[in-house]
Amino acid sequence: MSRRHKAEKREINPDPKFGDLVVTKFMNAIMLDGKKSVAENIVYGAFDVVQGKAKQEPLTVFHSALENIAPHVEVRSRRVGGATYQVPVDVRPERRQALAIRWLIAAARKRNETTMVDRLSGELLDASNNRGSAVKKREDTHKMADANRAFSHYRW
């Protein structure tokens, strides 16, 4: 553990179109090489496609997708007397959100549509309907935690 003081959380401003902090975090995670305007175009473009296909408010689809992806428990490695156990632990709310965003973007990047807008909109729609590889990742994480429930008394 570091003896220095904790790093301060940076203030982030809500996005200009929806006024939502989570959308800003999502944009920042999509952004590559500091190109925020490109990330904005991708996210807003995907939201437009979602609105066209789902006939729903894109923000509600986005939040339901994140909620369906976010894990409740995960496993952490804990070394006890020469053996390493995978110990299931509850996930803090900030980490839940961060993991959901990360997994959603990773799943979208792996898809095989032509543009990132199409990939992201497809993954958002799938995740909001409890399908897609990001939701599968959460299910696998929950299965791992369930399989290792016997080691839950090693929590710290």
Curated annotation (Swiss-Prot):
Under HAMAP family, the record lists: Ribosomal_uS7_B
Matching entries from InterPro entries are given as: Ribosomal_uS7 (IPR000235), Ribosomal_uS7_bac/org-type (IPR005717), Ribosomal_uS7_CS (IPR020606), Ribosomal_uS7_dom (IPR023798), Ribosomal_uS7_dom_sf (IPR036823)
List, alphabetically, the GO terms of the cellular component aspect.
small ribosomal subunit
Q: Which GO terms describe its molecular function?
A: rRNA binding; structural constituent of ribosome; tRNA binding
Assembly information from the UniProt record: Part of the 30S ribosomal subunit. Contacts proteins S9 and S11.
The entry's protein name is Small ribosomal subunit protein uS7
What lineage is on file?
Bacteria, Pseudomonadati, Pseudomonadota, Alphaproteobacteria, Hyphomicrobiales
CDD domains reported in the protein's UniProt record = uS7_Bacteria (cd14869)
Recorded source organism is Rhizobium johnstonii (strain DSM 114642 / LMG 32736 / 3841)
Primary role:
One of the primary rRNA binding proteins, it binds directly to 16S rRNA where it nucleates assembly of the head domain of the 30S subunit. Is located at the subunit interface close to the decoding center, probably blocks exit of the E-site tRNA.
Tell me if GTP-binding is a UniProt keyword of this record: no
Its keywords, alphabetically, are: Ribonucleoprotein, Ribosomal protein, RNA-binding, rRNA-binding, tRNA-binding
Source gene? rpsG
Gene Ontology terms describing biological process: translation
- Membership in a protein family: Belongs to the universal ribosomal protein uS7 family.
Q: Give the PANTHER family listed for this entry.
A: RIBOSOMAL PROTEIN S7 (PTHR11205)
